Amino acid sequence: MTALLVAGAALWGAAAGSLLPRPAHRLGVEPDQPWRSADPEGRPFTGPARGWLGAARGHGPATPQVALLTALVCAALAATTGARPELVVWLLLAPVAVLLGLVDRRVHRLPDVLTLPLAAAATVLLGLAALVPGHAGSWTGALIGELFLGGGYLVLVLINPAGMGLGDAKLALGLGAALGWYGPPVLLAGALLGLGLGALYGLGLLVLRRAGRATAIPYGPFLLAGAFGGLLIGGLGG
């Protein structure tokens, strides 16, 4: 049963991940620019979802790598969560999280069109999961985690706006809901892991003289990695 569950999650992740390069390319623009509507040769995007889903051959993230990454993320979540209701939530949110990481890594931007729906979806879907027998979390904990992590990052943004952006705080809303589902220890572990990974990356750049103190780094991928680690811990302990 577990092997089939993990295999199914991996197949879902691979299929969903194969559709992410196109939106990653289209959304990977500076804040003052519109979303891309054509490839570098000027050909308008066509295909599923009005050209928003699909590969981005020669002008975006490589499809095999993105599909593999998403498959591994989904498989790991299935292996640790098991056949519990919240696994459906994690598998639905995982491709969006991967997409956010791709965009932020590319242009240091976390678009509202992704972060806010992610937070809303996490809240609603976990509320539904809480109604299904066999779950291992708390919807109240998810709401508290959402407010705690989102509010915490908002404070960090206000203290150091050059180091983090409002996009990080908006992303933290959805991640806080997911981590808070498993309770305060997992919420704290995921939050600290994300901050720690970002700090280590920044320190490494300074040591290698590849960045200065004022250099902006994309925190989104590290926040996502921290939340992913927290969910693995929560799944194992649930």
Predicted features by range, described:
Residues 1-238:
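A membrane-topology feature that recognizes alpha-helical transmembrane segments
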